[in-house]
Amino acid sequence: MKAALRATGFQLEDIDLLAYPWSVTPRKFLHMNLKHVFRVLVLHGPGLAITGMRVIRDLMLPRLIAKRCASEMGKRLPPCDGVSHHLGHSACAYFTLPFDEAVVLTIDGQGEDESGSLGEWVGTSYLHFVSIYSPDSIGILYGMVTDFLGMRAAWDEYKVMGMASYGDPKRFEPQFRSLVEPLPEGRYRTHRTAMVFKPGYCEAMLKRLFNLAARTPDQPLEQVHFDVAAGLQDITEGVVFHLLEHLRKKTRSHNLCLAGGVFQNSVLNGKILCSGLFERVHIPPVPGDHGAR
């Protein structure tokens, strides 16, 4: 916050409202968390503690951040309000570009109850087209496979992206196609991602799917690991282009903005840029959660 004030020349007293890209309304709370509580409680009781911790964190985070900022600034803060996580991603992408209209696609693992959104900005007005709701999430699937390959989910996906260049995407294509289902109107569904927070679930499920033991971090990389990475990258690109083609048909805009953690995948971004679907493509310098703030 101090850096932002210095960069803009504003004082804290000039700010009317602080916006944080996380809005847990009662409806979103019920949709986002209770469905996981009931699913885990009925099917896998031991995982309930993990879900409970996520619920508490999500509800308390905006207040904790505001309290800490006030303490560090040494002043009373303006009102602090949460906005939809994917609206934050969308605004970050749009308001950092040099033109005044664009369609926007956001995709990540999960932000509140959404894992993606499609919409269009004209001036300062936003028209929302489609939301994709967790647990349908190509971002979650990418993290699951990253973990299966012996790396850290939500951290090492870039390594898996690099590994994909050395693999054969056809080897595990049927398995990945069984996990992802394109749907009409710019939607898709991911199968077997609902229980991602249950300890041990992802490893066991992917082991059966690929007929392959999970790699440990100290295990040498083998060709089969590169082939899994290639299949994952290929299905991810397919999902994204499915959504982009819907956007292209729905609007006349030639400008595209992209945001969310999935668009830290530079190989994917390069293919979008070279596809010719849109004349101009803009990705903010930090498309992940840090850029949504």
Sequence positions of predicted segments:
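Short acidic/glycine-rich loops and adjacent helix/strand connectors
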Residues: 1-293
